């Protein structure tokens, strides 16, 4: 009986911590003059707490495991909502594809530039110099 209570306590603690970060993010988002989703701010709060080891990862692990395990099921309502706007998406297919392609290329360029800026140019292992 004690072991099952301990497992239940771990799940309750995990979900309380996850939801506390979510609601803290929603509260902070309501105070900001710009529109940022509260769930994104809540994820950042949870990330900072975990990265700084203020919050042990083992405390939120059971809840995160459950959410990740059933993540596909959580996307079903979103897919149904998108299907309601199928005609609009079909009419705007070209601009959507072009904007996705351009934004992907911009991300590639920015990441490669920033990686080169941070890490610098590195020599290939085993290569002493460029042969002409």
Swiss-Prot record:
Membrane topology: Multi-pass membrane protein
UniProt keyword Cell wall biogenesis/degradation present: no
Transmembrane segments: 7-27, 31-51, 63-83, 93-113
Keywords of this entry: Cell inner membrane, Cell membrane, Membrane, Transmembrane, Transmembrane helix
Main location: membrane
Subcellular location: Cell inner membrane
Cellular component, GO annotation: plasma membrane
Coiled coil, from the record: none
Alphabetical list of PANTHER family matching this protein: HOLIN-LIKE PROTEIN CIDA-RELATED, UPF0299 MEMBRANE PROTEIN YOHJ
UniProt similarity note: Belongs to the UPF0299 family.
HAMAP family attached to this UniProt entry: UPF0299
Name the record gives this protein: UPF0299 membrane protein YohJ
Gene name of the record: yohJ
């Amino acid at each position: 009986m004690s072991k099952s209570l301990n497992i239940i306590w771990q799940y309750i603690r995990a979900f309380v911590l996850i939801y506390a970060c979510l609601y803290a993010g929603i509260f902070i988002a309501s105070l900001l003059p710009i529109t940022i989703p509260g769930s994104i701010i809540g994820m950042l709060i949870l990330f900072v707490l975990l990265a700084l080891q203020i919050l042990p990862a083992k405390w939120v692990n059971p809840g995160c495991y459950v959410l990740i395990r059933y993540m596909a099921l959580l996307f079903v309502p979103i897919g149904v909502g998108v299907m309601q706007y199928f005609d609009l998406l079909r009419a705007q297919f070209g601009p959507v594809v072009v904007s996705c392609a351009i934004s992907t290329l911009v991300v590639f360029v920015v990441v490669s530039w920033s990686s080169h800026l941070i890490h610098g140019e590195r020599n290939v292992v085993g290569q002493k110099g460029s042969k002409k």
